[in-house]
């Protein structure tokens, strides 16, 4: 099964190389970039496959030699070579299996992270603030860029809602699995009895549509309202109607932005968020059509799903999807998310791999 799939992809490599050899390929830069990325992926697969076949031939030859070798010293050399060859063949087998799950074209897309306070009132709003800080620090570690789209501060601190954009290498690859319900257990500062309270926030992660991606938004379906922005905690408050709220009437989706002093800039940011939400709806429709097996449904990013618990009294963080529990919440909340996000990427990659093997 694997060999058949590899040969199909190697045939595709020959087709891509033929297209890239045509001088007119540069006329469409978007298509050219996509082809060069596909070529790099397929060429990497070919190199690994060729090396595996060569080593398997060497392994077979050495095993045949060992059967007839009389010299004990040389026989030990052959055995050592066989062990090394077997180890490398296994490595290449795993590498090829992983390569048979093609890279997701969304991996490098800028990601819109939307955090909302849920059950727990002020404590949930404070936790939104904690998570915003956590993701900013994680972005710093990864070398990603950060941009605020909109936020609604809470009177007691934190945020009722916070929307930001992270951009950089593999942003969506790592951040997509943050979508869902995050539960926090801790003793609020106002709790005199020292009782642990449970609160929750929801997080949505939307890959920002590509500039060339067609998002069907009819102007007559949009209601655009302007109003005066409001702030808290000493933030600048406009005296002009610079804040913008856009309603997509057919779907009922509402987005807004008031962070910029310019109405034009606020409208641009609100439109970016609206387009991302509309693209997500289209993507979910496609996923539902394809999701005929559980493996395809895993990791759908359903924001109603409780995915993680942060227990501050025990310094414990648990990701329920992969049964991962760590007692280093103090590090994680300060941006050390690498271990958790990498474990999630590896887990869901294996789920995709299972699906690939079954096809």
Curated annotation (Swiss-Prot):
Function: Peptide chain release factor 1 directs the termination of translation in response to the peptide chain termination codons UAG and UAA.
The organism's place on the tree of life at top rank: Bacteria
Compartments where located: Cytoplasm
Biased composition (Polar residues): 289-299
Molecular function GO terms recorded: translation release factor activity, codon specific
Family indicated by similarity: Belongs to the prokaryotic/mitochondrial release factor family.
Organism: Protochlamydia amoebophila (strain UWE25)
Protein name as annotated: Peptide chain release factor 1
SMART domains associated with the record: PCRF
Start and end residues of each stretch annotated as Disordered: 287-311
One cellular component (GO) term of this entry: cytoplasm
In-chain residues carrying the UniProt-annotated modification N5-methylglutamine: 235
